[in-house]
């Protein structure tokens, strides 16, 4: 169905791509380029395209400039020449970006999940959750298998020379935790005992040595450590949203409150996005300057780094786009261009949770994912979908096995795959979370845990690549669910959202010839204008 052109002269109008509900809109020809994801022609259209993609370009340039600036400062003396005080001031703009993003994680995750869960009927909620978890499980298994295959093929640890203390970052003592205790900690964090403390603390098991019958015994002692328990908050928000829906009309006021709170948070996100290029530049540059000898580090661990980055590139540029193309029948690389800003932010911040606000905004405005999809799926994905971490952990496990001349039989390889897929959930979107859970995999296949100290030397780079792949998988999952709902709604024409009563009278429904996006009021175009249109949630 194509909307009617304006009365008068119909020349100079072309049909844009149909929206999710099958409506094509006639727009001026000069605007077609801006509607097709940034494909530009010449003249005014090029300038319009540059303005539309200015933030993306600035963010990508910031990453490149940060690498160049960091290498330049390192070549001029690095951290030793700057001194501690100047180095802290040099990295301060990046630290400020991290603080701004982390500031809005809590209200964004809680409000978006409560509103999303309350707005979906139970059957739709279960169906969406099941499809999302299936997608996350399959892609994580594929990433793990790819990591093991690349490590076995490239043999990154076969010709490795021992690293001395002058290489890379300071070597930290590798963490060690029993597999059972790690699983119990995961379950404990799913059900926090205090929601207030869960906003900034999580539960973990540590060990103390005690003398028992003349023998030193390692006794587990639990306690809380600094770090948001995002897994527990996600579970609580979903359950609370379902409970609000069960209340019926009595819970509608509270649902509207959480939706309004979430909209206000997204306004803050739109402001923070314009500071992101500056913060990313100094985050990347500051981390490179902190490294004592970048050249020696890459020479010693270059094959391991290459194996990890190559695996992330294959999974992110081939595997995930292929899955999206096969099931959604859309161009996956146009989808990737729409989330370029969150991907660059993920590289700079090295945190899936910190990238979540920008990812929500971009998938909704650039890639046409509905609000109730993105704000329900993306927080879950930031918690449980860790494709990059699973791939890196598999490469690291095989790398450490090769270092110690340990052979890996079929059973051990399967154990690595399954354990990496399961333990990646425990990373919970925190920086370097994958390294902390790598000890579980090494314990499962009886590999020495102390060799994790070698992985820590280059984790500053590999962890950033992991984060980019993690958030890309979350976005593709939301896009696939949007495509699935589009097909099922076209077949069944059953609305997924409940109607929330409002004191204000509802506007009349548009006639079929003027049908547009139902999430935007007063905008007849395919996606509306985010600057001039008033958003009205159907939740």
Curated annotation (Swiss-Prot):
**Keyword flag Iron:** no
Q: Which residues are glycosylated?
A: 164, 213
Q: Name one GO cellular component term.
A: plasma membrane
Binding, Na(+) 2: 383
State any GO BP term from the record.
erythrocyte differentiation
Xref: Pfam families: SDF
Please report the record's description of how this protein sits within the membrane. Answer: Multi-pass membrane protein
Q: Which regions does the annotation call intramembrane?
A: 333-363, 413-446
UniProt KW keywords: Acetylation, Amino-acid transport, Antiport, Cell membrane, Glycoprotein, Membrane, Metal-binding, Phosphoprotein, Sodium, Symport, Transmembrane, Transmembrane helix, Transport
> What's the protein called, per UniProt?
Neutral amino acid transporter B(0)
- Tell me what gene encodes this: SLC1A5
């Amino acid at each position: 169905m194509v909307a009617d052109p304006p009365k008068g002269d119909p020349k100079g109008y072309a049909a844009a791509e149909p929206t999710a509900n099958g409506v094509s809109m006639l727009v001026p020809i000069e605007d077609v380029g801006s509607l097709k994801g940034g494909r530009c022609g010449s003249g005014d259209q090029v300038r319009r395209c540059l303005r539309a993609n200015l933030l993306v370009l600035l963010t990508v340039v910031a990453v490149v400039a940060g690498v160049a600036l960091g290498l330049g400062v390192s070549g001029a003396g690095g951290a030793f020449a700057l001194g501690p005080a100047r180095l802290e001031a040099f990295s301060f703009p990046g630290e400020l970006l991290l603080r701004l993003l982390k500031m809005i994680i809590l209200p964004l995750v809680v409000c978006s999940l409560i509103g999303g869960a309350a707005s979906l009927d139970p059957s739709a909620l279960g169906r969406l959750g099941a499809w999302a978890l299936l997608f996350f499980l399959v892609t994580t298994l594929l990433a793990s298998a790819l990591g093991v295959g690349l490590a076995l093929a490239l043999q990154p640890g076969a010709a490795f020379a021992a690293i001395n203390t002058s290489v890379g970052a300071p070597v930290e003592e590798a963490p060690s935790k029993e597999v059972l205790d790690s699983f119990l900690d995961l379950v404990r964090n799913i059900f926090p005992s205090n929601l207030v403390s869960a906003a900034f603390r999580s539960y973990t098991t540590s060990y103390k040595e005690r003398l028992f019958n003349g023998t030193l015994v390692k006794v587990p002692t639990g306690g809380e450590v600094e770090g948001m328990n995002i897994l527990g908050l996600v579970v609580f928000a979903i359950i609370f949203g379902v409970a609000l829906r069960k209340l019926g009309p009595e819970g509608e006021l509270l649902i509207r409150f959480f939706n309004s709170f979430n909209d206000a948070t997204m306004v803050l996100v739109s402001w923070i996005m314009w500071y992101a290029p500056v913060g990313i530049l100094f985050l990347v540059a500051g981390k490179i300057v902190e490294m004592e000898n970048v050249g020696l580090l890459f020479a010693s661990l270059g094959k391991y780094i290459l194996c990890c980055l190559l695996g992330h590139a294959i999974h992110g540029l081939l595997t995930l786009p292929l899955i999206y193309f096969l099931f959604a029948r859309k161009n996956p690389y146009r989808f990737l261009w729409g989330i370029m800003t969150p991907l660059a932010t993920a590289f700079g911040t090295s945190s899936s949770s910190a990238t979540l606000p920008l990812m929500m905004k971009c998938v909704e405005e650039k890639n046409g994912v509905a609000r109730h999809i993105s704000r329900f799926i993306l927080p879950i994905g930031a918690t449980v979908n860790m494709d990059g971490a699973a791939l890196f952990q598999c490469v690291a496990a095989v790398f450490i096995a090769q270092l110690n001349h340990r052979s890996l039989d079929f059973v051990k390889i399967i154990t690595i795959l399954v354990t990496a897929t399961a333990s990646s959930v425990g990373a919970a979107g925190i920086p370097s979370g994958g390294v902390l859970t790598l000890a579980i995999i090494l314990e499962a296949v009886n590999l020495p845990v102390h060799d994790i100290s070698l992985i820590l030397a280059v984790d500053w780079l590999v962890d950033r690549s992991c984060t980019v792949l993690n958030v890309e998988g979350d976005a593709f999952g939301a896009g696939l669910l949007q495509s699935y709902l589009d097909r099922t709604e076209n077949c069944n024409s059953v609305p997924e959202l409940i109607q929330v009563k409002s004191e204000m009278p509802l506007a009349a429904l548009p006639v079929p010839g003027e049908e547009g996006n139902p999430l935007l009021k007063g905008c007849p175009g395919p996606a509306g204008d985010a600057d001039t249109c008033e958003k009205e949630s159907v939740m």
